[in-house]
Regions:
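Bacterial N-terminal signal peptides
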Residues: 3-14
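Short loop/turn microsegments at loop-to-beta-strand junctions
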Residues: 20-21, 43, 118-119
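Non-globular targeting/processing and membrane-anchoring segments
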Residues: 155-167
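Structural microenvironment flanking redox-active thiols in thiol-disulfide oxidoreductases
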Residues: 56-95, 106-110
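Short active-site neighborhood of thiol/selenol oxidoreductases, capturing the structured segment around
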Residues: 36-53
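Thiol/disulfide oxidoreductase modules built on the thioredoxin-like
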Residues: 90-97, 103-148
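N-terminal "domain-start" segment that seeds a small globular fold
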Residues: 14-35
């Protein structure tokens, strides 16, 4: 039932922006990471925190989603709390978070829209447009179902390039 509610929320989310959005935050090595660095791929922007139980529950699904779809999408974790970098790096390593993680410090940065609770996830199209938003946990299955639907609607350039690269 929870999956059905989540899937419905993602599927019924209308376009959130008609033009590309961008932001730049620092990763755990202090390097700048911009949303526009990932143009041409779907981006799953996930606001989370180490103290948030629902955030921790969705990490394995997000890792698997990222690992299985690196050619067509990226998961970008945005840590939405004030903790020191070494603690955060150890946390990320201990939870096998292989996708990029950036910090929303020094101030909470929410350029995609409101973050009223954690986790909050935005889906960004390969063109850089916000196409969906979900408050609460997401699952790999719900995201994949949503992306399959969106790819079928619009002739997704990321899907086309992945198809061209396939044998």
């Amino acid at each position: 039932m929870r999956l059905l509610v989540l899937l419905t929320a993602l599927l019924t989310a209308g376009p959130l922006a008609a033009e590309p959005v961008d932001f730049t935050l620092e990763n755990l090595d202090g390097e700048a990471v911009s949303l526009s660095d990932f143009r041409g791929k779907w981006v799953i922007v996930n606001y989370w925190a180490t103290w948030c139980p629902p955030c921790l529950e969705e990490i394995p699904d997000l890792v698997q989603l990222y690992e299985d779809n690196r050619d067509t999408l990226v998961v970008l974790g945005v840590d939405f709390e004030e903790v020191n970098t070494e603690y955060l790096r150890e946390f990320v390593d201990s939870h096998f978070m292989t996708y990029p993680v950036v910090r929303s410090e020094p101030l909470p940065v929410t350029p995609l829209g409101p973050v009223l609770g954690l986790p909050t996830t935005y889906i960004i199209s390969p063109e850089g447009e916000r196409v969906a938003r979900q408050e609460g946990p997401v699952t790999r299955e719900a995201i994949e179902t949503y992306l399959e639907r969106k790819r079928g609607e619009a002739g997704d350039p990321a899907a086309k390039s992945a198809d061209a690269a396939s044998p």
